[in-house]
From Swiss-Prot:
Keywords: Cytoplasm, Hydrolase, Nuclease, Ribosome biogenesis. Its main location: cytoplasm. Its EC number is 3.1.-.-. InterPro entries: RNaseH-like_sf (IPR012337), YqgF (IPR005227), YqgF/RNaseH-like_dom (IPR006641), YqgF/RNaseH-like_dom_sf (IPR037027). GO terms for biological process: rRNA 5'-end processing. SMART domains: YqgFc. It is found in: Cytoplasm. This is Putative pre-16S rRNA nuclease.
Length: 138
């Protein structure tokens, strides 16, 4: 059972995938957004390639737990994605995942240019790994 992790942004979508046992998350790619149809097609292709059963998408919340405008955009995108792909989509709190991704890359001595290219993919890994850890640590 493979699970896809998404970090949906305005310009890019970070993508991660679980191992077949659902224990660990690995980065797949960062999709440069063009239009809704192409974005969904790219995600669909990845789902087919990895035989994905469900999707976990990061839900951007404010630090006080409330939902803001970006949360609405992500939820709207995921609602459309769910209809198109007919897969379960779990919304997962993504607070501080991008901060954690940046911190890990800085500690790894990656240049700013390299960090910019992969930060969303790394954030998707954090989102998916957080979900996987919650499922298997019950």
């Amino acid at each position: 059972m493979r699970i896809l992790g998404l970090d949906v942004g305005d310009r890019t979508i970070g993508v991660a995938i679980s191992d077949p046992l659902g224990w660990t998350a690995q980065g797949v790619k960062t999709i440069k957004r063009s239009n809704l149809k192409n974005d969904i097609k790219e995600i669909e292709d990845i789902c087919n390639e990895y035989k994905v059963d469900k999707i976990v998408s990061g839900l951007p919340k404010n630090m006080n737990g409330t939902l803001g405008p970006q949360s609405e955009k992500v939820t709207e995108f995921c609602d459309i994605l769910k209809k198109e792909l007919e897969k379960e989509i779990i919304m997962w709190d993504e607070r501080l995942t991008t901060v954690a991704a940046h911190k890990a890359m800085i500690e790894g001595d990656l240049s700013r240019a390299k960090r910019k290219k992969i930060v969303d993919k790394i954030a998707a890994i954090y989102i998916l790994q957080g979900y996987l850890d919650s499922v298997y640590n019950k």
